[in-house]
Amino acid sequence: MWRWSTGVRTMLGYAMCFLALGSALTVRLHSTRTNLPQYLTREIGDDEFEELLRSSASAGHKWHVEQFVDGSRCYVPETEQNMAPVPDDLLERGIKLVEEATVGKKLEYLPISYWGYKFINSELNKTVIQHKDQHQVLLGSMVKADPQTVQHSLERDEDSYYISERFGDGDLCSLLEEDRTVEVQYRCKYDTPLEIILDLKEYETCRYTMLVSIPSLCELPEFGPYTRQTPANTIYCTAPATPEFNIATLVEAYKPTFLGHGFYHLAPHANLTHKETTAMLMYHQQPIPGNEEDDGTMDSAFIKHSTMAYMQLLEMGLLNGPDGLPFSEEGNFTVYAKVIGFDGGLITVTRFQISHGEVIIDHVVPEVLEDMEQGNSEDYEQQAPEQLDEEEAELTSQSDDPAIMRVHLQEFITPEYDAIE
C-alpha cells in the first residue's frame, strides 16, 4: 500500500505551514498559529497549559483557546487594547493622501504564481483585476461618484490604524453564484518608498484582501506603527504535534504550485530520478469527513474545490498524456490523483474525467491503488481502470450523491475564464 515515511510526512507538514504563511490579512482563520494577533507569544508544555487554564478560570480572567490543525493550542487573553485617540477627520485626511498618491496610476503585483494583479485608480472609479496573458477576472470595483459603492472605513490592528475600502461588483463566482468582492487596505510602510501592492490573498472562495503601501500615510502618526499605549498581552501556546524539519529538503525534492481553493500541486524536480507520482495534490483546508453520520456537505465542498484545482492544472498544462503532451479540455481522458494533507498523510484518491464536454470527479477507495506504489498520471490512466471494476472496489459515492461533481465543461471554461483561478 502507498505509504509516506515519517520524515516525508514531517517535511510536508512544515512546508505546508511555510507556504500558507500570511494567508489571512484581516480574518482570523484557525489553520496555523501565524493567524493569531501579533502579541507576545510564549511556548509552554501541555501540563503548564492545563494549569494556566485552571488558574485563569479561578481568577475570573477572560480568555479563549484556539485549536490548530498542527495539533497545537493557544491561550489568548481577551483584553481590549488601548489605542491612542485619533482626530475626528483622520479618515478624511487619510483618504485624501491615498487619492493624491494613487489617482491616475496603475499598480501591478506579479507574485511567483500563475496570476498577476492590478490596482487601477482612474478619475471615475477604482478596480482590482486578476490577469494572465489575455485572460482577466474583475475581483471588484468602486464608482467614486456613487455613494452606494463607496465603502471606506478607518480600521485598526494591534499596532496601528489603516484605511479599508471594500469593492463589490466583481465578476460572477460560479461556486458561490455571487459577485466577487475585494477589500483594499491602505497602510503606512516606512520601508517602501513608492506606492506598491504588498500582497493579495483569497481568504475565502472569491473573497480577496489586497494590501497596498502608501508611504505618504506615514505623514500622519496615527497610521504609523506602535500607536498602542499599553503593552501587548502574552499568548501561551503548546508545541505543534508535527516536529520541525529542514525546509530545504522539500525544496530539493518537490516543486509546489498553488492552485487556489486550498490545493497545492506537488511535482518532483526534473533533475531527480525518483518516480513519485506527478498527479499528487496537497490539501491544507478542513479535511473531508470520514464518518458515516456526516451529511456530506463538507465532502461536496471538497469535491467542488478539487474540481477547480484540476481545472487549474489543466489550464496550466500540468496534466500530461502518455505522449508527454498536455491534456486539453477538448479531449476525453481520466486522471487519478492522490490527495495528501499538510502532514503528508493520505486523505483520499480522486478520479477526474473529461468526457464529451462533461467534467466528472469523485472519490476512489484508496485501497484499490495499493499495487500502484510508483507511477505518474499516465500510469494511473492505464492501470487504474483494470483495478476499478465494480466487483473489486466500490466508489465512495454513487452518481446521485452530492459528493460527486458532474457538470458541463462550459461551466468552467468561459471566454473570460471566470471560474478558473
From Swiss-Prot:
Entry keyword set: Disulfide bond, Endoplasmic reticulum, Glycoprotein, Lectin, Membrane, Signal
One Gene Ontology molecular-function label: carbohydrate binding
Disulfide-bonded cysteines: 173-206, 188-218
Oligomer and partners: Interacts with missfolded ER lumenal proteins.
InterPro entries: Man6P_isomerase_rcpt-bd_dom_sf, MRH_dom, OS-9-like, Yos9_DD
Glycosylation sites: 125, 271, 332
Secretion signal span: 1-26
Protein name: Protein OS-9 homolog
Keyword Transferase: no
Main location: endoplasmic reticulum
Record-stated family: Belongs to the OS-9 family.
Keyword Magnesium assigned: no
MRH domain ranges (all copies): 99-220
One Pfam family it belongs to: Yos9_DD
Organism in which the protein naturally occurs: Eremothecium gossypii (strain ATCC 10895 / CBS 109.51 / FGSC 9923 / NRRL Y-1056)
